[in-house]
From Swiss-Prot:
Residues 1-21 are annotated as: Disordered. A motif (GXWXGXG) lies at residues 75-81. Gene3D superfamilies: 2.40.128.20. This is Ferric nitrobindin-like protein. InterPro entries: Calycin, Nb(III)_bact/plant, Nitrobindin, THAP4-like_heme-bd. Belongs to the nitrobindin family. It comes from Mycobacterium leprae (strain TN).
């Protein structure tokens, strides 16, 4: 998965018979999967006095009106991707849960696991949790279109991204602040691009600053909608 593919989003294949066939096939697969994913949601305890988190827009609280530009992200996403580490490239599996409770933020939880050459589980890998929201600044309407993504990583660092929607189905963010714990790994800032691509899948590309100070490819994945 490349940055261009994610940036262009859904409906980007070339206008050719081959492209049209690919698009039709992707739409058919997406429609087929949606009949299953539409009936799924994340588990919830029904004895709490607060609204339950939901990853299915058909259930639970209404999505906060300030988050409509992020609506396509809500759901449970599963798939595979490729990463680059100190020991070379590797494959990983991943699940991302994007939920809400009616508040002015989206809950974000991503966990991944390394895969061996046979595509089977090898070991746990990266995990992060956090929140998406839009900046609210009544004195600067343009700034109010900015996205905040606050993440805590299991590797021992906290990261704040800022960004903007590129269009109705893709979002680009860049690290603004980074803090590592005493036991955490040392990492550089990152740039992430998320997009809904052909077939309704969620794809992303992450580039991260290396020891030489330049952005280099770090992670990329394409995930299908499992729930929502």
């Amino acid at each position: 998965m490349t940055s261009d593919e994610v940036r262009d989003g859904a409906g980007s294949p070339a206008d050719s018979s081959k492209g049209n066939k690919c698009t039709a096939a992707g739409m058919f697969q997406a429609a087929k999967r949606s009949t299953v994913s539409a009936a799924r949601n994340i588990p919830a305890f029904d004895d709490l006095p607060v609204p339950s988190d939901t990853a299915n827009l058909r259930e639970g609280a209404n999505l906060n009106s300030t988050l409509l530009a992020l609506l396509p992200l809500v759901g449970v996403w599963r798939g595979e991707g490729e990463g680059r580490g100190p020991n070379g490239d590797y494959h990983f599996g991943q699940q991302i849960v994007v939920s809400h409770d009616g508040g002015n933020y989206l809950n974000w939880e991503a966990r991944s696991w390394r895969l061996n050459d046979a595509g089977e589980y090898q070991e746990t890998s990266l995990r992060e949790t956090g929140f998406w929201r839009f900046v609210s600044d009544p004195y600067d309407p343009t700034e109010s279109q900015a996205i905040e993504l606050l993440l805590a990583h299991s590797a021992g660092y906290v990261e704040l991204f800022y960004g903007r929607p590129r269009n109705a189905s893709s979002w680009e963010l860049v690290t603004d602040a980074l803090a590592c714990s005493k036991s955490g790994v040392l990492v550089g800032g990152a740039k992430r691009l998320y997009g809904i691509v052909e077939g309704g899948d969620l794809a992303y590309v992450e580039e991260r600053v290396d020891a030489d100070g330049g952005l280099v490819p770090n992670l990329s994945a394409r995930l299908y909608r499992f729930a929502g």
